[in-house]
């Protein structure tokens, strides 16, 4: 499959002691092949529960191409949690802590009772998903499914234990000896 092939050959950048994989789905560089995006979204649709879903939710930035494509395939509208405040009525701020940053995320466009699916590009520490789940609970949304494309580290387990929600992923990876390994 193209996702796994491109992960195995993607560049690795070391920052401090952490090895980052640089991939079109997680970083938008070097170039996003539409075949790869189509494959990923088709796989998300196959494993996801999109029945009676009102909205698809992601956090900026790399979830945006995923939910845009997914919305076109499913005709379900999407909502993007932004890193900046818009001060719209009902806006919900939540704190986000990831492996590389801390800050606020802001949720708009969710009504009480909305049935939602959460989509994210990568789960590693779980910080982004925990923030999204917290905001959606505050808004009164019903979370029907949570799908991340790439799983790395213990984030999936952390989110499942902390929130009680099951996380689906397309591929689990690690970086070993400067290369991505599919687990």
Swiss-Prot record:
GO biological process: IMP salvage; purine ribonucleoside salvage
CDD domains: PRTases_typeI (cd06223)
Superkingdom field: Archaea
Top-level EC class as recorded in UniProt: transferase
GO cellular component, one term: cytoplasm
Pathway connected to this protein: Purine metabolism; IMP biosynthesis via salvage pathway; IMP from hypoxanthine: step 1/1
A Pfam entry, by short name: Pribosyltran
Keywords, sorted A to Z: Cytoplasm, Glycosyltransferase, Purine salvage, Transferase
EC code: 2.4.2.8
Protein location: Cytoplasm
Catalytic reaction list: IMP + diphosphate = hypoxanthine + 5-phospho-alpha-D-ribose 1-diphosphate; GMP + diphosphate = guanine + 5-phospho-alpha-D-ribose 1-diphosphate
Chief location category: cytoplasm
InterPro entries in UniProt: HGPRTase-like, PRibTrfase_dom, PRTase-like, Pur/Pyrimidine_PRTase
Known role: Catalyzes a salvage reaction resulting in the formation of IMP that is energically less costly than de novo synthesis.
Name under which the protein is recorded: Hypoxanthine/guanine phosphoribosyltransferase
UniProt source species: Methanocaldococcus fervens (strain DSM 4213 / JCM 15782 / AG86)
């Amino acid at each position: 499959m193209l996702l796994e092939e491109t992960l195995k050959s993607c560049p690795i950048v070391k920052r401090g002691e952490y090895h980052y994989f640089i991939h079109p789905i997680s970083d938008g560089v070097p170039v996003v092949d539409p075949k790869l995006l189509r494959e990923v979204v088709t796989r998300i649709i196959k494993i996801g529960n999109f029945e009676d879903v009102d909205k698809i939710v992601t956090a900026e930035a790399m979830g945006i191409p995923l939910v845009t494509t997914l919305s076109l395939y499913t005709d379900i509208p999407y909502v993007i949690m932004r890193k900046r405040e818009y001060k719209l009525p009902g806006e919900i701020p939540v704190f986000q802590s990831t492996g590389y940053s801390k800050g606020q995320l802001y949720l708009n466009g969710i009504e009480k009772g909305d049935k939602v699916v959460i989509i994210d590009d990568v789960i590693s520490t779980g910080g982004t998903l925990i923030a999204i789940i917290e905001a959606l609970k505050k808004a009164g949304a019903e979370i029907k499914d949570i799908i991340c494309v790439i799983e790395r580290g213990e984030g999936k387990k952390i989110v499942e234990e902390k929130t009680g929600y099951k996380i689906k992923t397309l591929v689990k990876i690690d970086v070993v000896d400067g290369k991505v390994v599919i687990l």
